[in-house]
C-alpha cells in the first residue's frame, strides 16, 4: 500500500494570521510540522498542498515537496483531494499544518488499521480526557468525539459531549485530534459532496462524512497533540522547543 502524508497549508488563517510562517526557534511553523511528519514510519513521502507561493518558496528551500492548489478549497481535506489528483498513492493522511509538536508515532496510528488489512472509510485519532478536566471539555476550540462500542465515531462537536448530568466524574471524554487517513476513493467522494448542514453549524469537515453515511474509525492515542490557533498556543510551542524536550 502506497501511503502519502499530505499537509494542507494556507497563509490567511482566521484566528492567527500567517501562522504557517511563524518563527519557532529559527524555523517556520510549517517546516517544524514537516520535520516531524518525515519521521513517521508508515511512509517516507510528505507533501504540502498550498495555494500560497510564499509558503511554497519557503518549503522548497528546505527540499519539502509541494503541490500548488487553487484557492477554492473549503477545507483541508478538499485541498488534499485536489492535490491527490496529481499524486500516486492508495492512502492519503491529512496532517494539519499547525501541528509542530505532532509525535510521528501518532501519524503511524491512523495508518495502522489499513496496514493490518482493514478497510475503513476513514480513520482519525482521539485522546481520552477525564471528566474532571472541565476547562478542556467546555472549550469550544477543543473538538470532542463520541464513539460506539466498535470504535467508530457517532458524532463530533465543539460542545461537551456526552452531556454531563450531575457530578459523575467516571465518564471519559474524547478529544479529537485532527489527523485523518482516507482511501483515495473516499477522499474523492468527500470532495464531490457539498458541505453538510452539521458541518457548517459546527465548522467541522468530518461531519460531512458522517452525514453522508461514511464511517470514521477512531484510534485512541495516549499522546496529546496541541495545535497552534492562538498567540498563546504559539508561545507555548515556542517554549517547548526552547526547552528542547527529548521527545523533539
Swiss-Prot record:
Q: What class of enzyme is it?
A: transferase
Pathway the protein takes part in: Nucleotide-sugar biosynthesis; CMP-3-deoxy-D-manno-octulosonate biosynthesis; CMP-3-deoxy-D-manno-octulosonate from 3-deoxy-D-manno-octulosonate and CTP: step 1/1; Bacterial outer membrane biogenesis; lipopolysaccharide biosynthesis
The reaction(s) catalysed by this protein are: 3-deoxy-alpha-D-manno-oct-2-ulosonate + CTP = CMP-3-deoxy-beta-D-manno-octulosonate + diphosphate
Cited Pfam families? CTP_transf_3 (PF02348)
| GO CC annotation, single | cytosol
For molecular function, the Gene Ontology terms on record are: 3-deoxy-manno-octulosonate cytidylyltransferase activity
What are the coiled-coil residue ranges? none
Which family is it part of?
Belongs to the KdsB family.
Matches recorded under NCBIfam families:
kdsB (TIGR00466), PRK05450.1-5 (NF003952), PRK13368.1 (NF009905)
* Name the UniProt record assigns to this protein: 3-deoxy-manno-octulosonate cytidylyltransferase
Species of origin reads Chlorobium phaeobacteroides (strain BS1)
- What is the taxonomic lineage of the source species? Bacteria, Pseudomonadati, Chlorobiota, Chlorobiia, Chlorobiales
